[in-house]
Every structure is written in structure tokens, then in C-alpha cells.
A protein has these predicted regions:
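Helix-to-loop junction immediately C-terminal to a conserved catalytic motif
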Residues: 66
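Conserved ABC transporter NBD signature motif
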Residues: 74-85, 91-92
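Conserved ABC ATPase "signature" region
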Residues: 116, 120, 127-145, 193
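Conserved ABC ATPase signature
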Residues: 149-153
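Catalytic Walker B motif of ABC-type/P-loop ATPase nucleotide-binding domains
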Residues: 174-178
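ABC transporter nucleotide-binding domain
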Residues: 193-288
Length: 334
């Protein structure tokens, strides 16, 4: 259910507003800023992708935003409340959901009973609780497991139960920390589609993942953090424009692929100033180039001269993964 936004004094209200956030660890002689003066605002009813390599500060930031850790400095407003003043977080946490990578389970309870317990804790009772539990079991394809004890579930099944039970309560903001880890492709797509529908109904989502396809599909804004600092923050479209000087050429060859062909692409990667990177997967070679036409024509000629059958050629704009890797590379080299 969307919240009412307070626009006092014509000042825009955000679902999350973080200002000059710092988290420091260590003693006086060896202090380290794990979070180093970051600021960002997240609009209501959007998906905010929070990306970064391992150790960049993502988990620490989520722990601060969800009240597990106290910041060293900075201010945070969630749902228009300063969460570190006047006991505001106790009110705010009733309106947020959190799906972490390490869920806890009542191992001796069945899936349905444990779901009903969570519904009861969120204030649902009687038939309303049972109906909502069964609806979510159906949505996340858990109905056949309703009488199975949690301890007998696979990792992926437990993950689906964890996600389903979080949607038992009405929330305005959902923190998703790599929610698709352990899910098979069908369950993963089912979850992403359900999240998208909830966002259309007004839910705001703070989303971390290492799977860039999920970012492409869901996110309205992307924030990239590295070494505790924000290095990029914009819409996917504008980030692609910024890093869009390169194209990716995918050349798929008819197998088998001879050693001569691998040698050709290896030399191309080493000798051409127009090539940033070449990767191959089985019989497909992916060339990242700032001048695709200059690379493509001689490559196609070489393949035809050597009687190599080409199954497909595609030239693609940079992906979010390309943006992410290039932003990190530029930041690490600066």
C-alpha cells in the first residue's frame, strides 16, 4: 500500500534519504571508513539497485538502513522519519520488509504452519491469515510443499518460503539482499515478476545482486559503490549513454572451432587499439570494441577466406554489466 507523502514547505519527500553517511571500524591508530561519506535519495515506488564488488560496503549499508548497525556519522530518513531520533525506527520497521541471505526457520514446523505463524505476528488472524498464506504458497509454487517440514526443504525451497512469508505483511519498503541466490531459473523469474507487480502498486525496493540481468529487468536507479564510496548514481539509460562509446560484437561460428581461429582472436585482442576485450564461450566470440565496423569487416573476411561458417552476428549496446565493470575499472585506475 503506497504511503502518503508529506510535502511540507514544498520540499520533496523520499522513501529513503541518506546524507553524508560514514561507518568507521578500528582503533584510533588504524581507523577505516567502510562507508565513506555517501549520500543518495530513493523515490517512492521505484527499484533502487545498489551494486558493488565484494567488500565494497553494500552489506554494511543495508545493516545501517535496517537498524542493525549504528552509523559513525550522517543522517538517514526512511518513510519521512529520521530513524535515529525519537525512537522513530520502531515505527518505521513495521512498514518495511527485509529478505537477507541467511534466513532463520522454525525447522520442526511445516511450511504452512510457519507461514501462518508469521502472519499472526504481523497481525493477521483467522481466515484472513489462512487465505493470504495459501495465496502466497500458490504464487511462489509452494502449495505441494505446504505439509513439508522446513528442515526437509532444499536450499532453494527454503529461499522461496522466506520470500513468501515476507509478503504476508503490508509494507511500503522492501530490502532485498541478493534474493535469487539458490533459486532455479523458473523460481527466479517468478520472483522478479512478482516484485515488479508490487512496485507498480506502490512498493519501493532496495535491491542488491551480482546478477546484472536482474538489474536490467527491475531497476529504475542504479548506485555503484566501490571501497565505501559511491562512484556512479543514475538511471540505467543514462549510465549506458555515459559508457556507451563501445559496442559488443557477438560472432557465433559453426562448430568445431579450430585453434587457428582462437589464435586469430587472441592476436586481435592483443594488437588492435579498437578492441577493449574479447571473451569466448564455446563457439561464440564476444568482442567489446569502440569501433565495431573497423573490427567486424576484416574479421568476417578472414573467416570467409578460411571457409569458417558463421551462424550469427549481433552488435549490441553496452549492458549494465559492461557499465558496472567499466565504472569499477575507471575508479580503480584513477
Amino acid at each position: 500500500m503506497p504511503v502518503e507523502i508529506n510535502n511540507n514547505n514544498d520540499q520533496k519527500s523520499y522513501c529513503i534519504s541518506v546524507k553524508n553517511l560514514v561507518k568507521t571500524y578500528g582503533s584510533a591508530n588504524s581507523k577505516k571508513n567502510v562507508i565513506d561519506d555517501i549520500s543518495f535519495d530513493i523515490d517512492y515506488g521505484t527499484v533502487f539497485g545498489f551494486l558493488g564488488p565484494n567488500g565494497a560496503g553494500k552489506t554494511t549499508t543495508i545493516k545501517i538502513l535496517t537498524g542493525i548497525l549504528q552509523p559513525t556519522k550522517g543522517s538517514i530518513k526512511i518513510l519521512d522519519k529520521d530513524i535515529f531520533k525519537n525512537n522513530n525506527f520502531n515505527e518505521v520497521k513495521k512498514r518495511i520488509g527485509v529478505i537477507t541471505q541467511n534466513p532463520s526457520f522454525e525447522s520442526n514446523l511445516t511450511v504452512e504452519r510457519s507461514m501462518e505463524l508469521y502472519g499472526f505476528l504481523w497481525g493477521l488472524g483467522g481466515n484472513k491469515n489462512k487465505d493470504k498464506v495459501r495465496k502466497l504458497l500458490d504464487i511462489f509454487e509452494l502449495t505441494s510443499l505446504r505439509d513439508t517440514r522446513n528442515e526437509d526443504l532444499s536450499i532453494g525451497q527454503r529461499r522461496r518460503v522466506q520470500i513468501a512469508r515476507e509478503f504476508l505483511h503490508e509494507m511500503d519498503l522492501l530490502f532485498l539482499d541478493e534474493p535469487t541466490v539458490g533459486l532455479d531459473p523458473r523460481a527466479r523469474r517468478n520472483l522478479l515478476n512478482y516484485i515488479k507487480k508490487q512496485v507498480e502498486l506502490g512498493l519501493t525496493v532496495f535491491f542488491t545482486t551480482h546478477i546484472m540481468e536482474e538489474v536490467e529487468y527491475l531497476c529504475d536507479q542504479i548506485c555503484i559503490i566501490n571501497k565505501g564510496k559511491i562512484i556512479e548514481f543514475n538511471t540505467p539509460h543514462l549510465l549506458k549513454q555515459k559508457y556507451g562509446s563501445t559496442k559488443k560484437i557477438d560472432i557465433t561460428l559453426h562448430p568445431p572451432v579450430s585453434k587457428n581461429i582462437y589464435d586469430y582472436f587472441q592476436k586481435l585482442s592483443s594488437n588492435s587499439i579498437d578492441v577493449e576485450n574479447i571473451e569466448n564461450s564455446e563457439n561464440t566470440f564476444s568482442i567489446t570494441s569502440n569501433n565495431p565496423q573497423h573490427i567486424l569487416l576484416p574479421t568476417v573476411n578472414y573467416l570467409y577466406q578460411n571457409k569458417i561458417q558463421i551462424e550469427n552476428i549481433a552488435i549490441n549496446d553496452p549492458s549494465i554489466e559492461d557499465v558496472f565493470l567499466k565504472a569499477l575499472k575507471n575508479n580503480n585506475e584513477s
